[in-house]
A protein has these predicted regions:
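Alpha/beta-hydrolase active-site loop
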Residues: 29-33, 55-78
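Primarily recognizes the serine-hydrolase "nucleophile elbow" in alpha/beta-hydrolase
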Residues: 73-133
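Short, flexible/disordered intra-domain loops and linkers
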Residues: 16-27, 150-153, 184-189
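Conserved alpha/beta-hydrolase
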Residues: 34-54
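Second-shell loop/turn segments in exported
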Residues: 19-24, 33, 53-62, 142-145, ...
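The feature captures the conserved acid-bearing segment of alpha/beta-hydrolase catalytic domains
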Residues: 109-175
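C-terminal catalytic histidine-bearing segment of alpha/beta-hydrolase fold enzymes
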Residues: 166-213
């Protein structure tokens, strides 16, 4: 196994994982690509919302940082391989918070995809999650065809620059299919719908460059 990825879904964060492992809401990019990641040799830990409550506005709070600490500690019981954190849209706020909370050397890197960088209904962005405290390598992925107003691809360089103590890289992609009229839907260019294999492959190449095996 190459490593384990902590996956933080976007939106309200509630994917409704059942006790038997079934996932009721699996449209989100970091959830629906779990099998692609498994084929590439990565274990995946999908982080669900706490008590099925919306995570909007909670991901950058100190209370949630304590939860993230518990998640990191749990992940270390699963593997001694490189540990990653990946989030998409609102979930990128959580991934950024993991990166800024982790101890030195604890994470191999963080991946932020279609990150919320403009304040919307949640009232928080990746800039509220203390990006200056991130020390692990970071990848900011931005789809030039994403038209979600709270995640403009043009701000990707600004997100990377905010992680001033990290070796942060920006990856631009293009394409995707809009199955939903909502530009912030998982089933749109915002969620890499239709280009999942390409995006996962691009991210995986960066990850391998960070931790060659």
């Amino acid at each position: 196994m190459r490593g384990v990825i902590l996956m933080f879904p976007g939106g309200a964060g509630d994917v409704d994982i059942e006790r038997d492992g079934a996932i009721r809401h699996d449209n989100n990019f970091v959830v629906r690509t779990r099998e692609l990641w498994a084929r590439l040799g990565y274990g995946v830990v999908i982080v669900d919302a706490i008590g099925h409550k919306s995570m909007r506005g909670e991901r950058s709070t100190e209370a949630y940082r304590q939860v993230l600490r518990e998640i990191l500690d749990y992940a270390h019981t699963l593997t001694d391989r490189p540990l990653w954190a990946m989030g998409t849209s609102q979930g990128s706020i959580a991934a950024m918070a993991v990166g800024s909370s982790a101890r030195d050397g604890e994470l191999a890197g963080i991946v932020l995809t279609e990150s919320v960088s403009v304040v919307g209904h949640s009232g928080e962005t990746v800039f509220d999650a203390r990006p200056e405290r991130v020390r692990a390598p970071a990848l900011v992925v931005a789809n030039r065809d994403d038209t979600c107003t709270v995640a403009p691809p043009s701000r990707a360089p600004e997100i990377a620059a905010a992680m001033k103590n990290s070796a942060a890289t920006v990856l631009h992609v293009e394409g995707g299919v809009a199955q939903s009229s909502n530009p912030c839907s998982s089933l749109s260019p915002h969620g890499y719908f239709g280009i999942e294999k390409q995006v996962v492959g691009d991210i995986a190449r960066w990850m391998r460059s960070v931790t060659p095996q």
